[in-house]
């Protein structure tokens, strides 16, 4: 009886559902998939319909979240008190806990663009629209100022990636309707399968057109979103277009296609690197380290590295999850300070910043701030 009573919290509510258990299991059993299924079974028809409605109006919803976080950042004590009261009245699994380390709302996503001969289609994620990058979080400045893509300071990893492509002479397209697109992970992880499927259809329609029926690769600037987009097939098993879409993380693309065209005149002395669960699933740990080594002379991955437990917004719903998940890694970080700290996913950066007291930033932001093209003219035809 005690196990049954505690199971909803101990298992369903506080599972990060990141699938890292499968990497340790000799037969690849992923209990995160089970937890997502159990979450879905909790939702009735009305809840599923609400989740689908959010997906269908995602552009407005994500924009509202961005504005709300900006407002909260101006009155953090009031926002924290309001969220604490709401969590006493409503289930904690519905109301995130607001605290000072939660970033303000971020920048708008890069606008749709389609040059004459694009080499790649860029999928800028909504993570960096909803949550400001760490630099903006520190300065309190916001970047809706019509800046060129190369003006990356405070604009997040999406604009950093565009700047790196510009420096390397790589033409980039951004899909029409990107403001209403998402990888679908927020719905899947919470068990809103109807919303996840609705979003998957919209994304596949948009990417199919912008990639010229799968001929161009799709590059994504947040590792969890890359992983989510790469796994859309199970939501649309009968859609023959899905396997033809080539999804790649921006870190891997940068390591292979951009770094050879750049020099980094001023490296950091040392960098602590937090790989993510998604980089493990995607198999791009070496590429992440390669980019980090372009930023700093010494790259340190803590021996106690593991899932940060932030898991999208789950670290805000259940802060104790992140506290427990990061304890060993945070101790390693404290024992060996470095000049800078990096990862490749905004919410993981938030989780590690909270756990360690250090400012974690996307490794592409750090690279874009330090790099210069080797010979920009020599690469303009790519």
Regions found by a protein language model. Give the residues of each.
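Ferredoxin-type iron-sulfur electron-transfer modules and their immediate structural context
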Residues: 1-15, 26, 32-47
